């Protein structure tokens, strides 16, 4: 069901008679709960219903006991048209967000043993997770093809020359039909660590793409999507972290999470959402702590601090690479080169060629990803997740949530901006970063040092 713009929630007294929607058809005198699990909801708990009154759709809240519904005329309901908006959608969003993965699946995602060359894309939500996942996937598939040629006796120079002659994919058809895109949705080939078990994926299994020409292709390195903090991530692999201006993160998260949890747009205010996130509503913690944790785990190379948990066996290697969403927008080729160098496995020969970098950038272009949005919309994991939180199946078809966005902080309320800035000063300033721009500058300085090694 597509929900109309929110025009103000209404509260109805017990016994009021209204017209209520049974999904697409209107049936007078009935109430339909959008989320009802009798064994899990205590007596007296409230939950949302969709109603129709004078051709206006909105949300109301009524007792969970469906036997107590609506037996009287609409007069009392009419009187309460201007009632104070209820805030229960926020609680429903938090409840659903908490229930989106099973405890067993979370434990499996955090406790399995990665291979040393496995790469986790460990971003805070809305920092460019899907975009960086596509970058890493395109890097590994590019290297896979070159590895096949190398196995047939071709030298690196011969391989690069052959790729250069072919040219990068430029037409829509070339890109849409590329063998690297032979998946339904990208989490099928890049499992989400703490949701993989719920989705029937084995984190120890090979990650493969089937090609009509090449057959079954087992890709290396294996890639995993994650929003986990340093303290919760499965240790022993390699970790790519993307940071982003917290104001932009907040705006994008605010526009994304409620509909992702089946909550209509507009029923939660930016201020309410901000308070909830600050209070720990996100499974991933807060963005500031996430940034600081991954920055501190990446300082082994600076000799500032180290952790045996994340230290690679090779002293000359590193296993945490950090970049920014803004740098991906401003200079994607440089980010691709750095990702390629970071992801290099023992079987790889040489860095990515300029042709390789151009090809990867073509396949990670926003226009291309938007045109193929169904491959990047989480529908593979969302089907299972929505079953768990009991969002009605009839809503799935219209419930796609776009994940390819350029984003921007936009017109956030001043009170929200102040809270975001205050939190930065509390968490990041003591670490030596008075502002987000200072943090980005430090990340770039670190990456330049690695470029020169």
Regions found by a protein language model. Name each.
Residues 3, 54-81:
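Intrinsically disordered, low-complexity, charged/polar segments
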Residues 27-36:
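Short beta-strand-centered aromatic/proline hotspots
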Residues 1-18:
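Mixed-charge, Lys/Arg-rich low-complexity intrinsically disordered regions
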